Amino acid sequence: MESTDKLTDTNAILAYLYETFPLCFIAEGETKPLKIGLFQDLAERLADDSKVSKTQLRVALRRYTSSWRYLKSVKAGAQRVDLDGQPCGELEQEHIDHAQAMLKESQEKAKAKRAAQTPKAAPAGKAPAKKAPKKVAVPARKTERPAKAAPKVEPVVNLVQAQLTDLAKKQRVNVKLGMTPVAGVITDINKEDIHVQLDSGLTIKVKAEHILL
């Protein structure tokens, strides 16, 4: 029987790692580059911990190492650290270049997405034509509407295919429907059939291979 304390949300798993390995996973401020092969050490250290699975740890680790905060820490002179915060050697230039390229690409994508969602302004030098004011006793005032704020850009989350053993009732998951994953909650697990209630209210039955975490 699965523990009722099992963590299913990636943010909750990251918070657990911040608490369990505070010298390795930094919750706020500048982070430290992680030891190569740290996932294996993490999986072994938490092998008897029923709160997390290897799949969930892999998703959380990928989220942590793809964040801008982490990519900015991969720079010349920085030391990699293990789970206990012990130095494991300096970074190689190849890894620094790769991290900076990933950071630049991610920032450019976010900038392009914001630009696409922001209403286009009138071209410079082409002011809208003004009509001659009408002569009236009391000129009517136009109510100015406040400009709409640009929608908040959500961070890109890398989803991975779930294993049946990683799933539990009331767990938040994403279901592969066409090209775009759809969010929902697991309502029942019957052998290999997973019943998921989508956020739209629709309940569907899928296999574990169609579930993303």
Curated annotation (Swiss-Prot):
Q: State the compartments where it is located.
A: Cytoplasm
Q: Which stretches of sequence are listed as region Disordered? A: 105-150
Output the superkingdom of the source species.
Bacteria
Query: Under the GO molecular function aspect, what terms does this record hold?
Result: RNA strand annealing activity; RNA strand-exchange activity
Sorted alphabetically, the keyword list is: Chaperone, Cytoplasm, RNA-binding
Q: Which Pfam families match?
A: ProQ (PF04352), ProQ_C (PF17516)
Q: What is its main location?
A: cytoplasm
Q: A biological process (GO) annotation for this entry?
A: post-transcriptional regulation of gene expression
Extent of Low complexity compositional bias? 115-127
Q: Which GO terms describe its cellular component?
A: cytosol
Q: PANTHER family per the record?
A: RNA CHAPERONE PROQ
**What family is this protein classified in?**
Belongs to the ProQ family.
Protein task: RNA chaperone with significant RNA binding, RNA strand exchange and RNA duplexing activities.
Which HAMAP family does this chain map to? ProQ
Name of the protein in question: RNA chaperone ProQ
State the organism named in the record.
Answer: Shewanella oneidensis (strain ATCC 700550 / JCM 31522 / CIP 106686 / LMG 19005 / NCIMB 14063 / MR-1)
